[in-house]
Regions:
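Short acidic-hydrophobic sequence patches enriched in Asp/Glu that either
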Residues: 40-43, 189, 193
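Short, hydrophobic secondary-structure boundary micro-motifs
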Residues: 103, 208-211
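Alpha-helical substrate-binding/gating segment
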Residues: 195-207, 217-235
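N-terminal Rossmann-like NAD(P)+-binding domain of SDR-like oxidoreductases, especially those catalyzing
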Residues: 1-183, 223, 233
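A glycine/serine/threonine-rich, flexible loop-to-helix segment
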Residues: 139, 190-198
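Glycine-rich "substrate-gating" loop/helix at the edge of Rossmann-like oxidoreductase active sites
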Residues: 150, 181-191, 211-223
Length: 235
């Protein structure tokens, strides 16, 4: 593949696995992560402990909402490709702090797109979410309309998708949007169901049920997600 690859949110669950795969393939990786307190930041430190000292890995502790700081990172590094994973996650928390979700997921994405345009990035991968489908019929279809978001989180992800499409149409930026369905696996986020259920089972605690227990989720294993992201980056 070659060149320098920027991974935003690279110390998170998915991002750390992406960085690890790239480093193991001898790629040069620039990682931006703000190590926020959505969950214990020490978990993120642990996520990247195996690669943080690798000479092909550069870590910048910064927020994608800080345009000037991120631009400085672009100025210091020849970034050829971008995997944009950084985002405020979580459906329920998005209702409690909608402004923060807009700031990170919309404005932050706009910052990265603008810098990608300015610095001539070759390929831009944006990771969206299955939540944008709202209460769509099952099974999902790629032709399903996505104008019925039912959470602030989903709305911000859809806004970011539209921005990505606009930068492709207006500036020719090579953009690929991936709508990820619930990801699970090693180093999974502690707020996600697999982590919570496992912890409660080990502690012999009751598992809280939302609704009537008939809802279903599509789960995707982390290594499959990483393979898909890398394939999109190489196309």
């Amino acid at each position: 593949m070659g060149g320098h690859i920027l991974v935003t949110g690279g110390a998170g669950f998915i991002g750390s696995h992406v960085c690890e795969r790239l480093i193991n393939s001898n790629e040069k990786v620039i990682c931006i992560d703000n190590f926020n307190d959505f969950y214990n930041p020490e978990l993120k430190e642990n996520n990247i402990k195996g690669i943080v000292r690798n000479p092909n890995f550069r870590l910048y502790r910064a927020s994608i909402t800080d345009f000037d700081k991120v631009k400085d990172i672009f100025n210091k590094n020849k970034i050829d490709k971008i995997i944009h994973l950084a985002a405020r996650a979580g459906v329920r928390p998005s209702f409690r702090n909608p402004g923060l979700y807009q700031e990170t997921n919309v404005k932050g994405t706009l910052n990265i797109l603008e810098l990608a345009k300015e610095f001539g990035v070759q390929n831009f991968i944006f990771t969206s979410s299955s939540s944008i489908y709202g209460d769509a019929k099952i099974p999902f279809s790629e032709d399903t309309l996505v104008d019925n978001q039912i959470s602030v989180y989903a709305a911000t992800k859809r806004c970011a998708e539209i921005l990505c499409s606009t930068y492709h149409n207006s500036y020719g930026l090579n953009v690929t949007i991936l709508r990820l369905f619930t990801v699970y696996g090693p180093r999974g986020r502690p707020d996600m169901a697999p982590y919570k259920f496992t912890e409660k089972i080990f502690n012999n605690e009751e598992i809280e049920m939302y609704g009537d227990g008939t809802s279903k989720r599509d789960y995707t294993y982390i290594e499959d997600i990483v393979s898909g992201i890398i394939a999109a980056l190489e196309k």
